[in-house]
Regions:
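Bacterial N-terminal signal peptides that target proteins for export
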Residues: 1-11
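C-terminal motif of bacterial Sec signal peptides marking the signal peptidase cleavage site
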Residues: 18-21
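Conserved functional micro-motifs across diverse proteins
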Residues: 23-225
Length: 225
């Protein structure tokens, strides 16, 4: 088989670079408000993509971490309720109960569904006390929260593929929660600052997974408010 000619290699690299540039376009800004939305089941896919982010850390040893994180905001949860109620044929009463539970959950904590894969399976241990990973949530002011819980979730494959399709046969799924600080807790404007950053840090580096509001003040302006 003939080797690829130099011009072919250059063209291939150019195409790869162009594709990479397109795939790394900035995600759309989101709406952190509690606006009520009339989502249909067919809206779920686009809403899911809007609230899901992807980040990857690569070193000489391979992929240190690759993660797909979905922030379970009230906007996302409304689309989830619509899709879940449609799939499982919920009554109006059961749907209303589910919607209220989702609203209460969104007000109690910042919750993320995260699918993670690593080159070496033993690195994928975010939930362990001995894990080298430090997981934190930051906002536009630089305020930081530690997680209330990090749990490995083993969901039925048909369910997870339908509701969190970023999963693959190589990923491990986590539910990561950060409780909203009470009135006497540390100041954390959170989504009100216009930005949330889910950070995964280890000795080899870190990834920041970011959600920005459609319009928000700068970090300096937020800190001065």
């Amino acid at each position: 088989m003939r080797s690829l000619q130099p011009c072919g290699r250059v063209l291939g690299l150019a195409c790869a670079a162009a594709w990479a540039g397109c795939s790394m376009s900035a995600p759309k800004p989101v709406d952190f408000s509690e606006v009520t939305r009339d989502y249909r089941p067919t809206d779920y896919s686009s809403v899911y993509e809007n609230w899901t982010r992807h980040a990857k850390l690569v070193r000489d040893v391979g992929t240190v971490i690759e993660a797909w994180a979905t922030y379970k905001s009230w906007g996302f949860r409304q689309a989830y309720v619509s899709q879940y109620a449609s799939i499982y044929g919920l009554s109006d009463s059961d749907r209303a109960t589910l919607a209220q539970a989702q609203l209460d959950a969104s007000r109690a904590s910042y919750d993320f569904h995260v699918a993670v894969q690593t080159t070496t399976d033993r690195w994928n241990d975010l939930d362990r006390k001995s894990s080298p990973w430090r997981v934190t949530l930051l906002d536009a002011t630089g305020a930081e929260l530690g997680p209330t819980s990090i749990q490995v979730v083993k969901l039925p494959e048909l369910y997870e593929t339908s509701f969190f399709p970023s999963r693959t046969e190589f990923t491990r799924s986590y539910e990561i929660s950060f409780a909203h600080p009470g009135s006497g807790g540390q100041p954390f404007p959170g989504s009100a600052s216009g930005r949330l950053i889910l950070r995964f840090a280890c000795p080899m580096g870190q990834i920041d997974i970011v959600w920005d509001a459609k319009s928000h003040p700068t970090a300096r302006e937020s800190a001065q408010e």
